[in-house]
Every structure is written in structure tokens, then in C-alpha cells.
């Protein structure tokens, strides 16, 4: 069996899909379906079982057996960069991850987990997986950074695989439940389909991020499981492309619309990553050599998926 925490969420459900595509259906999805809309991410997928996150954590802490577990993909977390309840964030992202890590280490179960580019904070260069480059801007980034630091202490002694992926700006299918935290491509598509003007912040040609397609993210996760490599790795494309490029690809697909530029909100000033670009040196050195989709390629594929029933 393979366990996917956050399996009804954005990246988790895409990992489930990638496993299904390889013929793997013996999957336990762990999630919190208090937001009932997330079930739509699983309706076209095949899994063996579902368990609530709280029940799962109780069983993990009690050391209960889940049978022959081949791996745990730990994607379950609070991923809101605007959530400032630090106790909630540390319980949910840090403490929970530690419990799961030790469960896996004791049983030598491969543990593949979601870290984040938010660990780098407001940098504009050198997004490198090393302590001197890490300075998160928000409590979400701090919770991810602290767990990475915890993993670094354990890695030299670990007898089983531990791998963390610092996801950059992931976009693609199955993110509709994320609301305001969904990608710009998702929001632009919604605005166009609602007959509204698609909106970007003023200066969006200058805001550049490493936008990585979720299908590529899932592929990297599965490659690492198959190849057994440990470590903490950036997971982006290695390219920074502008929000304007995302909009251009969206409008090109829809063949309509004109961008309306809106003022940059004061509340985000100083807490907003204006530039991200993954340094892929370590990922490539680990042996992953496949190309990543460009914004034009990924957004076009995503638009086709979003509008498949149109």
C-alpha cells in the first residue's frame, strides 16, 4: 500500500493520479474533508481506502500497523501563506510531519514530503538548498523551513529514504478548492468564463516566478520513489517567467479578453515573493533529467483540462 496524506488536495490528488496511471490503486488517502468540495479531486481516481487526518494521526502516534506500506507521500499541510495562527501552523505542518517521519524511520518506510520555496523568503537570486539562503517571510514558510532543518539533522543517520521537495509556484488540475490560494492561471480562466476582464496586479510583467506544472511535480515524486534518492531538493523548472506570460498563454487559449491591471494591495507589500527561480543543480545531480513544461506549454494543457466540458 502507498499512503498519500493531503491526498484529496491539489498536489496529493495529482500524485494519486500519477500512481493510477502506473496501474497502482492500493492507495490510502488521508485528508481532512471538512471542506467537502475537495472530494471532486478524487472522483475520477481509484483508491483502496480513505481516512480522516485526525484518526490517522492517532493511529500513527499509537504505532498501529497499516500493513505492508511501500511509501508515504506527505502532502498534507496548511498551505496558506496568509495564515498567521502560528500554533495551528506549527501543529499542522511541523509536529504532524515529525510524528510521521519517525513512524517511517522506525519501519524503514520511504518518506517523501512537501517542503516549499517559501523557505527562501524574499530572495531575488540564489534559491539554493542551503541554510545561508533561507529566511522565510511568513509562518507557513517558517514551519516548512524548521521541518527541513529537523530532517537535515536526521538524514546522515537514516536507514531509509527521506526526501523533501521545495515546491515553487505549482499550478494545474485539481486546485479549484484552494480559493484565493489557487494559481493565477486558474483565476484568469474563471474570470474569462464569467465574462469578466481578467485581472493582474500592476507591474505583472516584472513579477517573475518559477511556475511549475503539477504533472511534472507528480512525475518527480514518483521518480524519486523509484530511485530511492534522499535529500532536500528544489522542485521548479529552473526558469522564472512573468505573470504576464501566464496571462498571455491563457488569453491565447481563449482567443479573447484584455487584461485589466489593478493596484498592488498594501497588505501584501513586504510579504510577497516578487521573484523565484529554482536552482536545479542538486535535482539534476540526483539523476532527474527530464525537461519541465514552459508556462506556454503547461498553461495551454491546463486550460484544455479546465474547459474540457465546455
Curated annotation (Swiss-Prot):
Residues found modified as N6-acetyllysine: 267
Sorted UniProt keywords: Acetylation, Carbohydrate metabolism, Isomerase, NADP
Pathway where this protein functions: Nucleotide-sugar biosynthesis; ADP-L-glycero-beta-D-manno-heptose biosynthesis; ADP-L-glycero-beta-D-manno-heptose from D-glycero-beta-D-manno-heptose 7-phosphate: step 4/4
Co-factor: note: Binds 1 NADP(+) per subunit.
Enzyme category, top tier: isomerase
Function: Catalyzes the interconversion between ADP-D-glycero-beta-D-manno-heptose and ADP-L-glycero-beta-D-manno-heptose via an epimerization at carbon 6 of the heptose.
Alphabetized InterPro entries for the sequence: Epimerase_deHydtase, Heptose_epim, NAD(P)-bd_dom_sf
The protein's Enzyme Commission number: 5.1.3.20
Cofactor dependence: NADP(+)
Quaternary structure and interacting proteins, as annotated: Homopentamer.
GO molecular function ontology, one term from the record: NADP binding
Source organism phylogeny: Bacteria, Pseudomonadati, Pseudomonadota, Gammaproteobacteria, Enterobacterales
Residues binding substrate, per UniProt: 169, 180, 187, 201-204, 209, 272
Catalytic activity: ADP-D-glycero-beta-D-manno-heptose = ADP-L-glycero-beta-D-manno-heptose
Active site: 140 (proton acceptor), 178 (proton acceptor)
Family, per entry: Belongs to the NAD(P)-dependent epimerase/dehydratase family. HldD subfamily.
GO aspect biological process, one term: carbohydrate metabolic process
Keyword Isomerase (UniProt): yes
Chain sites annotated for binding NADP(+): 10-11, 31-32, 38, 53, 75-79, 92, 144, 170, 178
Underlying gene: hldD
Domain notes: Contains a large N-terminal NADP-binding domain, and a smaller C-terminal substrate-binding domain.
Protein's name according to its UniProt entry: ADP-L-glycero-D-manno-heptose-6-epimerase
Amino acid at each position: 500500500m502507498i499512503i498519500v496524506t493531503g491526498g484529496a488536495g491539489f498536489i496529493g490528488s495529482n500524485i494519486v493520479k500519477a500512481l493510477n496511471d502506473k496501474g497502482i490503486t492500493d492507495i490510502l488517502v488521508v485528508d481532512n474533508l471538512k471542506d467537502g468540495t475537495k472530494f471532486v479531486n478524487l472522483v475520477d481516481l481509484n483508491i483502496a481506502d480513505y481516512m480522516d487526518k485526525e484518526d490517522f494521526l492517532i493511529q500513527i502516534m499509537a504505532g498501529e500497523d497499516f500493513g505492508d506500506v511501500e511509501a508515504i507521500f506527505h502532502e498534507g499541510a496548511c498551505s496558506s501563506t496568509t495564515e498567521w495562527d502560528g500554533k495551528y501552523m506549527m501543529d499542522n505542518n511541523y509536529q504532524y510531519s515529525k510524528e510521521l517521519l519517525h513512524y517511517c524511520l522506525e519501519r524503514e518506510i520511504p518518506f517523501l514530503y512537501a517542503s516549499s520555496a517559501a523557505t527562501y523568503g524574499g530572495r531575488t537570486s540564489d534559491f539554493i538548498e542551503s541554510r545561508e539562503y533561507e529566511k522565510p517571510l511568513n509562518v507557513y514558510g517558517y514551519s516548512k523551513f524548521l521541518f527541513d532543518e529537523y530532517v537535515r539533522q536526521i538524514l546522515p543517520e537514516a536507514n531509509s529514504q527521506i526526501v523533501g521537495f521545495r515546491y515553487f509556484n505549482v499550478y494545474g488540475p485539481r486546485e479549484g478548492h484552494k480559493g484565493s490560494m489557487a494559481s493565477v492561471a486558474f483565476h484568469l480562466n474563471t474570470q474569462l468564463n464569467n465574462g469578466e476582464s481578467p485581472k493582474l496586479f500592476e507591474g505583472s510583467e516584472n513579477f517573475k516566478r518559477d511556475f511549475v506544472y503539477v504533472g511534472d511535480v507528480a512525475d518527480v515524486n514518483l521518480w524519486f520513489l523509484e530511485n530511492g534518492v534522499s535529500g532536500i531538493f528544489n522542485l521548479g523548472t529552473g526558469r522564472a517567467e512573468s505573470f504576464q506570460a501566464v496571462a498571455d498563454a491563457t488569453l491565447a487559449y481563449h482567443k479573447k479578453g484584455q487584461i485589466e491591471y489593478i493596484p498592488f494591495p498594501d497588505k501584501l507589500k513586504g510579504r510577497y515573493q516578487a521573484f523565484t527561480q529554482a536552482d536545479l543543480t542538486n535535482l539534476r545531480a540526483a539523476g532527474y533529467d527530464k525537461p519541465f513544461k514552459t508556462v506556454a506549454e503547461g498553461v495551454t494543457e491546463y486550460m484544455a483540462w479546465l474547459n474540457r466540458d465546455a
